[in-house]
A protein has these predicted regions:
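Conserved small/polar residues in nucleotide/adenosyl-binding loops
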Residues: 139-141
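TPR alpha-solenoid repeat register
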Residues: 39, 81, 115-116
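Alpha-helical segment of the N-proximal tetratricopeptide repeat
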Residues: 4-28, 32, 48-53
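Canonical positions in the second alpha-helix
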Residues: 29, 70-71, 105
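Structural signature of tandem alpha-helical TPR/SEL1-like repeats
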Residues: 17-24, 52-67, 92-104, 134-136
Length: 141
């Protein structure tokens, strides 16, 4: 079964408004297709979408983070996976992780002669916004 065929079911479920079904299907597929980066990445994206929609951690953030990391581990050359993980880390207010991953993403773009993109522009703005709302008195230097 090709990757496109494997992911067709969850994509159709999402199109039909069944995000929960798509996530459940991808969760099962992660166990069956442990070495398929696209399955792990799509699960992380859909699960994050679910949490954003619910404005709550319906799906544990740690599980989402592990799915992103697994996708990156399986396909180290995929810049999209790095950018998506960095964005997720920033959404979770894990600023040091986000900064590290955005730096790695920028380096990959540079090595591939790809100009700096909108992802990095938005990241810099969102990092500044996140720092502005943090209680910096809690940070010990």
């Amino acid at each position: 079964m090709s990757d496109d065929e494997l992911l067709q079911g969850p994509i159709e479920m999402l199109r039909n408004g069944d995000l929960d079904g798509a996530i459940a299907d991808l969760d099962a597929k992660m166990g069956q297709h442990k070495k398929n980066a696209q399955v792990h990445h799509m699960f992380a994206e859909f699960a994050n979408m679910k949490n954003m929609e619910a404005q709550d951690d319906v799906i544990p953030g740690g599980k989402i983070m592990m799915a992103y990391k697994k996708a990156m581990q399986l396909d180290e050359e995929n810049e999209e996976y790095i950018a998506d993980f960095a964005t997720f880390a920033l959404e979770c207010r894990r600023i040091p992780v986000a900064v590290k991953e955005f730096q790695r993403y920028a380096k990959k773009l540079e090595l591939n002669d790809i100009p700096t993109d909108e992802v990095l522009f938005n990241a810099s703005r969102n990092i500044v916004d996140a720092l502005e709302v943090m209680d910096l008195s809690l940070i010990h230097i």
